[in-house]
C-alpha cells in the first residue's frame, strides 16, 4: 500500500506530466502560426523532453558534436518544446557572430540565479545594457586592457617567479607535481593581487579554502545551468534542488569578500583608486556615480573573476602540457625556440612572447583542442532569419565551440595537436574561426590576460624542467563540468634542466 508521502510524490509526478503535456499542445498551436516559413532541420527527439537527453550527457559537447555530424551543422532542438538552435561549424558560427552579434548579446538570467554568486548582480550573465557596459569599461580600464596589463606586469612577474620556485622546490625534493593545482595558485594569486592588491595566505589555509570554493562553484554552476533548462512548470522544484549547496557557496564567498571590503573601507586613502576593488568601492559610495552599484555587485564580480579568470587558464595550461608530453617532437621544437630567444641565464618574461611564434602557436592549438568553455549559450532577443531559416524570438542559441574548432571543413587533421598550423598564412586566416574565448560583444574581455598566463606558465615549465610521467602517454579523458576538465589530473616528476638567474629580491609571502 502506498504511504501518504508516496501518494503525494506520485500525484506530483502526474501533475508535472500532464502540465508538460498541456504545455506541449499549447506550444504546438503557437508554433503553427509560423507555418509557411522555412524552419531548421530537427533530429529525431523523445516525447515530452525533446532533445534534453543530449544536454544531460556527462560530455554534452561530444554528444552534440555527434548529433551535428549526423544531421548537419545548424540544427533546431527542443527542450520540453522550448526552441534551441545548435551551431557546430566554423562558417555558421562566424556568420552568426558577424551578422547577429547585437541580437545575441544578452543572456537570460533565470530565477535560480537569485541566490547564486552572492545575489543576482552578476556581470557575465547580465543583459546587454548600461550596467553591463559600465562594468566592462571598469574591467578593461583597471584590469584587462593593454594599459592596465602594462601597469600590473611586475605583479605577474613576481607570481611567475614564485610559480617557478614552487616547482623547483618540489623538483629538488623529487615530489610529484599536480600541474593544474600549481597553475591555479599562479592564476588566483595573480588575479587577486592585480585586482585588489592582496593575495590569499597559504599558511592560514585561506588560499586552499578559496581554491576549494572555486572548484565547488564550478561544479554547482554546471548543475544550475542544466537545471535551468527545466522551465515552467517546474520552476519551484528546480530552484529548491540545489538550494543548500547554493547557499553554502554563496554565503562562504559573501563572508570572505565582505571581510576584504571592510578592510579596504578602514583604509580609504591607502591605494587611491589603484586597483579595481578601490574603483568599485568609490562608485559604490558615490551617489552621483555613472551607474549605481551595490556591495553585491562588487562581490559578484570578484567571484566571477575567480571562477572565469583562474580555473579556465589553469585547465588550459594542464591540457596543453599534457599535449606537449604526448607529442615530444612538438616539445623539443618549442624548447629549442625558447632556448634560442631567452637563453639559460634568466626566466622567460612577458616581453619575450612576441618573439616566440611557436609558443604562441602551441597556446592557440591547446585552446583549439580544449576550449575552456566548450558550449556557449546566448539568447536571440528578436526573431530573425539565419541562412534563410526563421528563428523565433527568445530562442536559445548554443554554439558548440568544441565542435567548431574541430570542424574538418576548416581544420586539417582537426583532432591532431599540430601547432605549426598557426604558423602558415592560410591557417592564420582560418584562426578567425578560433573562438576559444567567444566572439563579438560578449566575447571574454580577459582573453589577452589568459593568453599571457598560459604562455608564460608553459614557457617556464618547458624552459626549466624535463617532465616525466607514469606510463608512456598522458590519459586525455574528460570529465563533465562547466569547464573542460581532465578526468585524471596531470601529475609529473620535474627534473631541473636549467636554473635561470632569479633576483635576490624577496618575493611577497603567500
Swiss-Prot record:
Pfam families: p450. Its main location: membrane. Keywords: Heme, Iron, Membrane, Metal-binding, Monooxygenase, Oxidoreductase, Transmembrane, Transmembrane helix. The keyword Oxidoreductase applies. GO terms for molecular function: heme binding; iron ion binding; monooxygenase activity; oxidoreductase activity, acting on paired donors, with incorporation or reduction of molecular oxygen. The chain crosses the membrane at residues 7-27. Its EC number is 1.14.-.-. PROSITE patterns: CYTOCHROME_P450. InterPro entries: Cyt_P450 (IPR001128), Cyt_P450_CS (IPR017972), Cyt_P450_E_grp-I (IPR002401), Cyt_P450_sf (IPR036396), Plant_metabolite_P450s (IPR051103). Its cofactor is heme. It is found in: Membrane. It is a single-pass membrane protein. One of its GO terms (cellular component) is membrane. PANTHER family: CYTOCHROME P450 705A20-RELATED, FLAVONOID 3'-MONOOXYGENASE-RELATED. Belongs to the cytochrome P450 family. This is Cytochrome P450 705A20. It comes from Arabidopsis thaliana (Mouse-ear cress).
Amino acid at each position: 500500500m502506498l504511504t501518504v508521502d508516496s501518494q503525494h510524490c506520485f500525484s506530483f509526478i502526474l501533475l508535472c506530466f500532464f502540465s508538460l503535456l498541456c504545455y506541449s499542445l499549447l506550444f504546438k498551436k503557437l508554433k503553427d502560426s509560423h507555418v509557411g516559413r522555412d524552419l531548421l532541420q530537427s533530429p529525431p527527439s523523445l516525447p515530452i523532453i525533446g532533445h534534453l537527453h543530449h544536454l544531460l550527457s556527462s560530455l554534452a559537447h561530444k554528444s552534440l558534436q555527434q548529433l551535428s555530424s549526423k544531421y548537419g551543422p545548424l540544427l533546431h532542438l527542443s527542450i520540453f518544446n522550448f526552441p534551441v538552435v545548435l551551431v557546430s561549424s566554423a562558417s555558421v558560427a562566424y556568420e552568426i557572430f558577424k551578422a547577429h552579434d547585437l541580437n545575441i548579446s544578452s543572456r537570460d538570467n533565470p530565477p535560480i540565479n537569485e541566490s547564486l554568486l552572492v545575489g543576482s548582480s552578476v556581470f557575465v550573465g547580465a543583459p546587454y545594457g548600461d550596467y553591463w557596459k559600465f562594468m566592462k569599461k571598469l574591467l578593461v580600464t583597471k584590469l584587462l586592457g593593454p594599459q592596465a596589463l602594462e601597469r600590473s606586469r611586475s605583479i605577474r612577474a613576481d607570481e611567475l617567479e614564485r610559480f617557478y620556485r614552487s616547482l623547483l622546490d618540489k623538483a629538488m625534493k623529487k615530489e610529484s607535481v599536480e600541474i593544474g593545482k600549481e597553475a591555479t595558485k599562479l592564476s588566483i594569486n595573480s588575479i587577486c593581487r592585480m585586482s585588489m592588491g592582496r593575495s590569499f595566505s597559504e599558511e592560514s589555509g585561506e588560499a586552499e579554502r578559496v581554491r576549494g570554493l572555486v572548484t565547488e562553484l564550478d561544479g554547482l554552476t554546471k548543475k544550475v545551468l542544466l537545471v535551468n533548462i527545466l522551465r515552467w512548470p517546474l520552476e519551484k522544484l528546480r530552484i529548491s534542488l540545489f538550494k543548500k549547496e547554493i547557499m553554502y557557496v554563496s554565503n562562504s564567498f559573501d563572508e570572505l569578500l565582505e571581510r576584504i571590503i571592510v578592510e579596504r573601507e578602514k583604509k580609504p586613502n591607502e591605494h587611491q583608486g589603484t586597483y579595481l576593488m578601490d574603483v568599485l568601492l568609490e562608485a559604490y559610495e558615490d551617489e552621483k556615480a555613472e551607474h549605481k552599484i551595490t556591495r553585491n555587485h562588487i562581490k559578484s564580480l570578484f567571484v566571477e573573476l575567480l571562477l572565469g579568470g583562474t580555473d579556465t587558464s589553469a585547465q588550459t595550461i594542464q591540457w596543453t602540457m599534457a599535449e606537449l608530453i604526448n607529442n615530444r617532437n612538438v616539445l623539443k621544437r618549442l624548447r629549442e625556440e625558447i632556448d634560442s630567444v631567452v637563453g639559460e641565464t634568466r626566466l622567460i618574461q612577458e616581453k619575450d612572447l612576441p618573439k616566440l611564434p611557436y609558443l604562441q602557436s602551441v597556446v592557440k592549438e591547446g585552446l583549439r583542442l580544449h576550449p575552456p568553455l566548450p558550449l556557449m549559450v546566448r539568447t536571440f532577443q528578436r526573431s530573425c532569419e539565419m541562412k534563410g531559416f526563421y528563428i523565433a524570438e527568445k530562442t536559445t542559441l548554443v554554439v558548440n565551440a568544441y565542435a567548431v574548432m574541430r570542424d574538418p571543413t576548416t581544420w586539417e587533421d582537426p583532432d591532431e595537436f599540430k601547432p605549426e598550423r598557426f604558423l602558415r598564412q592560410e591557417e592564420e586566416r582560418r584562426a578567425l574561426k578560433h573562438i576559444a574565448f567567444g566572439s563579438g560583444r560578449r566575447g571574454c574581455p580577459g582573453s589577452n590576460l589568459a593568453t599571457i598566463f598560459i604562455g608564460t606558465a608553459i614557457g617556464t615549465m618547458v624552459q626549466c624542467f624535463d617532465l616525466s610521467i607514469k606510463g608512456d602517454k598522458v590519459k586525455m579523458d574528460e570529465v563533465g563540468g562547466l569547464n573542460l576538465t581532465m578526468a585524471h589530473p596531470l601529475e609529473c616528476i620535474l627534473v631541473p634542466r636549467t636554473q635561470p638567474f632569479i633576483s635576490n629580491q624577496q618575493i611577497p609571502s603567500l
